[in-house]
């Protein structure tokens, strides 16, 4: 970390409003700056936030792979992605070393961490939070249909995902969880920097394997919904024969695979347009070399 600044992004999706309230409350309490690390707060997609919609033209959190040499100013989210990188990127006018992207979900994900790829500094931050709070980690990788995430535009970054909460609905419990994470993150980094804390030797992650669409008829319309026994069961294993969907006649469509899966984002409202009913993962234990802590501040 060279600048000692961390970018905290809220409302990357405009209808996820609890993070905005959280950072405003945190700021008013005088917690923006300490002697070691400075937080920079920004609303990711302010126009979508004003309108209460997820995005204007395109999902901002799928736009950061499109900004290089892209001069199409007609797409609001690409303009916004360019602005964020030009201002807060490592070579920007107000450079930040780390980006933390705050999100809410309608799925029963609890408080969780999302990582994109296997960058060592990301593992370092994720391990600190998992060790302190026991948070599950969703490692999203190797999905060609899902790319261009905000935190990938910084050398280190994580998504904090909290749910369930409805879109455009304030929930004090959700807000409080964000406040705890925002406060604790800086404390943990300071402890690590001052050699007051050791990195855990391992981290447990749920590695993305793919996504499942709703069953559909020949007309392309959804003809079965998530099974009642599967709803709200994020992070809980699915084994062969377990129910996944139920159609209008009450018939169950079950999982027929051999391997145990761990589902995430079950029934996420925003993913319906992406033809995703849920994503599924496998568990992996990753050993963390002590060297990544030393490299974190270089």
UniProtKB/Swiss-Prot annotation:
GO terms for molecular function: aspartoacylase activity; hydrolase activity, acting on ester bonds; zinc ion binding. Keywords: Hydrolase, Metal-binding, Zinc. GO terms for cellular component: cytosol. Zn(2+) binds at residues 13, 16, 103. Gene3D superfamilies: 2.20.25.160, Zn peptidases. Its cofactor is Zn(2+). It is an enzyme of class 3 (hydrolase). InterPro entries: AspA/AstE_fam, Aspartoacylase, AstE_AspA_cat, Aste_AspA_hybrid_dom. Substrate binds at residues 54, 61-62, 161, 271. Binds 1 zinc ion per subunit. PANTHER family: ASPARTOACYLASE, SUCCINYLGLUTAMATE DESUCCINYLASE. NCBIfam families: PRK02259.1. Belongs to the AspA/AstE family. Aspartoacylase subfamily. This is Probable aspartoacylase. It comes from Prochlorococcus marinus (strain MIT 9515).
């Amino acid at each position: 970390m060279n600048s000692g600044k961390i970018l905290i992004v809220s409302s990357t999706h405009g209808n996820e409003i609890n993070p905005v309230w959280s950072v405003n409350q945190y700021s008013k309490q005088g917690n923006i700056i300490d002697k070691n690390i400075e937080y920079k707060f920004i609303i990711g997609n302010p126009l979508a936030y004003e309108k209460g919609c997820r995005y204007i033209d395109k999902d901002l959190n799928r736009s950061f792979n499109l900004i290089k040499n892209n001069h199409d100013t007609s797409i609001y989210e690409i303009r916004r992605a360019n602005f964020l990188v030009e201002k807060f990127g490592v070579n920007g006018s107000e450079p930040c070393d780390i980006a933390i992207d705050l999100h809410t979900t309608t799925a029963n994900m609890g408080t969780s961490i999302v990582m994109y790829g296997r960058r060592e500094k990301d593992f370092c931050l994720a391990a600190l939070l998992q060790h302190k709070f026991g948070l599950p980690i969703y490692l999203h990788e190797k999905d060609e249909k899902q790319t261009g995430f905000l935190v990938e535009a910084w050398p280190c970054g994580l998504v904090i995902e909290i749910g369930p909460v409805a879109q455009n609905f304030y929930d004090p419990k959700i807000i409080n969880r964000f406040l705890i994470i925002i406060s604790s993150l800086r404390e943990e980094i300071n402890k690590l920097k001052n050699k007051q804390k050791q990195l855990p030797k391992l981290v447990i992650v749920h590695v993305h394997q793919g996504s499942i669409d709703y069953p559909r008829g020949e007309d392309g319309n959804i003809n079965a919904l998530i099974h009642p026994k599967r709803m709200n069961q994020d992070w809980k294993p699915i084994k062969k024969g377990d129910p996944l969907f139920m159609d209008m006649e009450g018939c169950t469509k079950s999982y027929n695979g051999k391997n145990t899966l761990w589902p995430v984002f079950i029934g996420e409202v925003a993913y319906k347009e992406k033809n995703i009913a849920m994503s599924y993962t496998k568990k992996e234990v990753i050993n963390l070399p002590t060297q990544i802590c030393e490299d974190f501040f270089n």
